């Protein structure tokens, strides 16, 4: 789920990044979920047994949680109510740590990186690379001082232009006490997934993408689809927008909302929503391919560089 509707990055192959690049995102006023709203959400899902008490909140999907001025309050609330949480950040900025309490309840924190040079950051995120590194160091120092002992790692997005940078990223990760996880970058909800797989992506878009993204591993995913489908199995989950609307999955934002979670009053009602969405997709094999590609982030590519996981 998201807790705001803004991101500060300009990722080329991301739904939100493209909206930032085109100016589309500027049409919408900033919204920041506050603690009372999160309290209402958590209580609703617990009271109606939509989620179990040990459910894990992933408080990120499309937007950058550190931009929410209520982030510390939400994390404090989760600790006080025994809720599990993990978080992802692009480290373009640091959250306000001043009101943050003990962080022993945080399961993990992930730092997304599109490379390890200013050149790579200029092409994708658009941040000051040195500032990003400093923000990562500051974040880990602040969290560890507050009792964080969870999994902390860099999610290194592999592009054709940044392969030689992974060793620098590994050295940096080691110096900060982080794990390194490398993945092939992919179309992230930005609309090219299906056209690429159906062969309808425009020649210009294809030319641009093939300069930067890797595609060869897609044939491996499809060739051994059953193996990877089994490997990618997850616990049941709900995907919510920042406005507490149920959305079809992690590849969608609030513009694809189905209904408000507050209109659903049982696990069975939520399951019926997702079963209905699955039925509408039918058995078109393209959706299996999209699922495989979108979940390939679970596969570490460290072995290609002789780097242990």
Question: Residues of each region from the PLM?
Answer:
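Conserved SAM/AdoMet-binding glycine-rich loop
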Residues: 6-9, 16-20, 35-115
């Amino acid at each position: 789920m998201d807790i705001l509707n803004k991101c500060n990055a300009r990722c080329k192959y991301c739904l939100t990044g493209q909206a930032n690049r085109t100016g589309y995102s500027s049409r919408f006023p900033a919204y920041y979920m506050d603690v009372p709203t999160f309290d209402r959400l958590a209580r609703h899902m617990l009271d109606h047994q939509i989620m179990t008490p040990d459910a894990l909140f992933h408080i990120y999907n499309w937007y950058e949680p550190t931009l929410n001025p209520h982030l510390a309050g939400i994390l404090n609330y989760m600790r006080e109510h025994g809720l599990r949480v993990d978080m992802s950040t692009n480290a373009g900025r640091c959250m306000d740590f001043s009101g943050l309490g003990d962080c022993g309840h945080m399961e993990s924190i992930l730092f997304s990186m599109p490379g390890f040079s200013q050149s790579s950051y200029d092409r994708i995120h658009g941040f000051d690379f040195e500032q990003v590194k400093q923000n990562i160091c500051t974040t880990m120092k602040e969290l560890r001082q507050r009792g964080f002992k969870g999994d902390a790692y860099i999610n290194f997005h592999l592009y054709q232009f940044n392969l030689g940078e992974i060793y620098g990223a590994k050295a940096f990760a080691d110096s900060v006490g982080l794990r390194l996880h490398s993945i092939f970058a992919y179309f992230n909800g930005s609309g090219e997934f299906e056209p690429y797989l159906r062969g309808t992506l425009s020649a210009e878009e294809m030319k641009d993408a093939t300069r930067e993204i890797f595609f060869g591993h897609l044939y491996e995913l499809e060739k051994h689809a059953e193996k990877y489908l089994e490997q990618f199995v997850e616990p049941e989950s709900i995907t919510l927008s920042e406005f507490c609307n149920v959305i079809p999955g992690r590849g969608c934002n609030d513009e694809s909302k189905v209904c408000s979670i507050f209109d659903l009053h049982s696990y069975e009602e939520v399951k019926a929503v997702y079963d209905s969405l699955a039925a509408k997709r039918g058995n078109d094999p393209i959706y299996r391919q999209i699922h495989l590609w979108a979940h390939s982030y679970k596969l570490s590519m460290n072995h290609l560089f002789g780097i242990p996981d």
